[in-house]
Amino acid sequence: MYLNFIVLDLSLSHLVILLAHNNKVVYKNKIALKRDRAGILFNSIQSMISELNLNLSDLDILFSTIGPGNFNGIRVSLSFVKGFAITHNTKIAGLSSLEAISRSFLNNNEKKIFSIIKASPNFYYIEFF
């Protein structure tokens, strides 16, 4: 089990950064995205590191959402995670955007949930958990 990790989601209209320490969420930030997703991500990560006095070598794994969603956001997130993993010898993993949304509501409950993202006027991504 991974105790210290970061989850990044740039696949939708907001950047979401979540940091867990000892398997408990200690930091969560949600920022509206317009343009310059990479700049917003890097500035947000830098702010988090400064605010929490975070030692990046303590991270066990980094997660990035892998879709469905905005291709450019997914590409920026994956590029950051892969670059970080190479320079810090850290594990990485992908996470469905729909699963990330669902997990924020489930909190280890046994309830079932539908996660839905509107893709276009008549098209939706749907997953059941």
Across the structure, where does each feature detected by a protein language model lie?
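Stable alpha-helical structural segments in soluble proteins, enriched in small hydrophobic residues
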Residues: 48-52, 81, 87, 105
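Surface "functional belts" at beta-alpha junctions
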Residues: 24, 33, 91-129
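Short amphipathic alpha-helical segments
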Residues: 18-19, 76, 106, 128
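N-terminal beta-alpha supersecondary unit
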Residues: 2-64
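DPxDG-like acidic metal-binding loop motif
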Residues: 61-97
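Short glycine-rich anion-binding loops that position phosphate/pyrophosphate groups of nucleotides
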Residues: 13, 67-68, 119-122
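Generic domain-boundary/flexible-linker signal
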Residues: 16, 28, 73, 103, ...
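Short amphipathic alpha-helical face segments that pack within enzyme cores
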Residues: 40-43, 79, 100
